[in-house]
Design a protein with these regions (language model features):
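Short, compositionally biased P/S/T/A/G/V-rich stretches that sit at domain boundaries
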Residues: 18-55, 138
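Short edge beta-strand/loop segments characteristic of extracellular beta-sandwich folds
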Residues: 56-62, 73
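Solvent-exposed serine/threonine-rich low-complexity stretches and specific carbohydrate-binding patches
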Residues: 80-93, 133
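Aromatic sugar-binding surface patches on proteins
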Residues: 91-104
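A short tyrosine-centered beta-strand micro-motif
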Residues: 109-121
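Short beta-strand elements
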Residues: 126-138
Length: 138
């Protein structure tokens, strides 16, 4: 009897879709310039934005499939400021998406703690919902 129960558990575990395991966040954060994948691959810390510099939220995600939707948002506190959404036309080993402003708003960025918010959906289901550590713009 125990053998049958274990066999059923193994079958159930094997039949669970691996979609959530396949997609993973490689990099997520905010910096003061538009980044390239090569820059993120080096693993060097990127400079944080300040109230008087550009601010770009970025996310690099691996294991995405055709039809997946990836969304990156630059957020101040609980207020979304700038958002970029992309639906993939084909499978992608890694995908970099950015949202932000390459210029500086008149008078600088408003006070607050900023973070990058990432959402990845597949077939209408949330695969990944993650935020970077909040940082103040000084």
């Amino acid at each position: 009897m125990l053998t049958r129960v274990l066999f059923v558990l193994v079958l159930l575990g094997a039949s669970v879709p691996a979609s959530a395991e396949e997609a993973k966040v490689l990099a997520l954060g905010i910096t003061d310039h538009q980044v390239a994948q090569e820059e993120l691959d080096k693993g060097v810390a990127l400079p944080p934005p300040h109230f008087n510099t550009p601010a770009i939220a970025y996310a690099s995600v691996a294991g995405l499939k055709k039809g997946d939707t990836i969304e990156i948002t630059l957020v101040n506190g609980d207020t979304p400021l700038l958002r970029n959404t992309e639906t993939l036309a084909e499978d992608s080993q890694s995908f970099l998406l950015q949202a932000g402003k390459r210029g500086v708003p008149a008078g600088g960025w408003p006070e607050g703690s900023y973070h990058a918010a990432l959402k990845v959906t597949r077939d209408g289901k949330m695969l990944i919902e993650q935020s970077s550590q909040p940082i103040p713009f000084d």
